Amino acid sequence: MRKRLVISISVSIYLLLSIWPCILCQSSFAEVKGKEEPVQGGTYRRPLEFMPRTLDPVLAADIYSVSVIHQLFDGLVQFDQNLNVIPAIAKSWKISHDGLTYTFFLREGVKFHNRREVTAEDFVYSFSRIIDPKNKSIAASLLEKVSGFKEFQDGKTNSVEGFKSVERYILEIKLSDPFYPLISALGTIHFKVVPKEEVEKSGSAFAKRPIGTGPFKFVSMKEREEIILAANPDYFEGRPYLDRIAFKIFHGAPREKILKEFKERSLEESFVPPEEMGEVVKGKPYLFLQKPILSLRFYGLNSLSKPLDNQNLRKAINFAIDKKAIVSEIHNNQFHLSKGILPPGMPGFDPGKNPYPYDEARAAGFMSEAGFPKGEGLSSLEIWSASKSEAAQKELNEIRSQLSRIGIQCVIHFETDWPKFESMLRSNKAPVFIYAWYADFPDPDNFLGILFHSKSKNNYIAYHNPEVDRLLDQARAERDYLKRMAMYRKIEKMILEDAPIVPMINHLFQMVYQPYVKGVEVNALGGPYIPMKKIWLKKRE
C-alpha cells in the first residue's frame, strides 16, 4: 500500500524470506522473548509522519491509515511473520477444485468493540461496502470476479450474489472466474469486518470514530496531533499487553525531528535518517531493527501529460538517472537499488533484469528519437513530492541536475499535506511525481495489477496497454503457480519496455526502539502491519 519518499502508501509458503536476514543490533527480540515473561501495562508512543486520511478500512489508501486500522480491526485471515496466510476470525476455510467457491468457517464468540458478536452476515455487509461505488474503494478491483459484482455496482441489484451467509458462522464467496490471488488479498487492510449498525448510525463519521474487533479500541483523535487507542479486554486472542497506543502525528516534519523526540524518550520508536545511522546503530543502548520489505519507490511519468505521452522521452529519462549514485551518495545505501517493478522476495522476481542502467549517451539518443535533441522544443517538467525532508530535497536536486545534462529542465514542487497530494495524483494533475508502493499482500498482482492495470484506481500514471490488461486478467485466473509466475515476469518486461515509471529503490524497514521495548515482530510488509498486540514494555528500574 502506499506512499511516500518516504512518502508514500500496501507470502504464502512459497515466499523464500530466508534469503533476507533480519538485523537487530544490541539485542534480539526473539532471544529476549524467550528469556523474559511479558508484562502488561504502559502506553506505547508511536510516530506517524502524516495524519491518516481515514480509519475506515474500506477507504484506506495510505500507510498511515493502515498503521492505525491494523490495530483496530480483524479480517477472515492474516499474515504471519513469514507472510503465510493464517486464520484470524476464520478458523478454517476450503476452496473448491475449480477455484470458484471459497467457504470460511468463523470462530464463535468474536465481538465488536460494542460487544455484539460477529457473524457471517457482517462479512457479507463489509465486503459489499468494498464493491459499493459510493465508497470508491481502491480494493474494489480485487473483487471483480465475485459473482454479481457488476450488477451490484451498476445498481441493478441490492445485494452481491457471490457473498452468502450460509449459516451464522459460515461465509461463502462465489466467483464467476478463478482469481487465485484472492486468499492472499483477503488479508489486506480493506477486508476487515465492520458492524453495519455502527457504520449506518455514524455515516461518514465512522472514519473518525471507528468500531472494530481488534486488539485495541479507538479512544480519541486530535487532527494533526495524535490518535489514542486502548486495549480491548475482550479480544478473541486475549488482551494485548499494552494499555494504550498513542500515535503522534508529525505532519511531514523531517525525520530528524522524530529522532530527536525519541532520544528525549518522548517516543518508543523512531525512523533513522541516513546521516544519523552510524551514531544510532553503534555504541548506543537502543535496539535497531532492519529488514527488507516488499516495496518500490519510483518516479511516476503521467502519460496523460504532454510531452510524457512520448515513450522515447520516458526512456530517455530512465537512462539519464544515475540511481546507483543517488542510493549510495545521498541515502548512504539505506535502500536496495531497484532494477524493476517487483521487489526482491516477491514471487515472480527476476534478479537478472536491469532494463535501464545509467547511460547518458543512450538517454541522449532517445531524446533525439523523441523529437527533442538536446532538449530543443521541450518545456520544463514538473516534479511533485510529498516529502520535503533534507534527503528528499537532495535527491530531487540531483535528479534535476542529471536530467539537465540531456536537455530536460525540471521544476520541483512540494505538497506535504498527504490527502491533498494523493488527491492530485488521483486527478492526474502531477506530470512527474515521487511515490512509494508498499505491498498489501505478497502476490505479484499487488504491484503489477494494482499499479498498472488500466482499471485500477491506483494507476496514477494513467498507464494503458490493452495487452498488459489482457495478460493480467489471464494471470489472475491461472491455477498453475509456475505458469502464473512466468506470466507476471512477461508482464513486468512489457511494462518496463513502455517506461511509465522510473524504478528507484526497494525499502528496508529500519526502526530504532527504546531498550525496554519487547516483542516486536516485522514481516516483509513492513511497519504498518506490525502486530502491536504482541509488543510489551519492560518495566524500567
Mark where each language-model region is.
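Ligand/substrate-recognition segments at binding pockets and active sites
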Residues: 223, 368-439, 481, 509
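Long beta-strand-rich cores associated with HINT superfamily self-processing modules
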Residues: 511-541
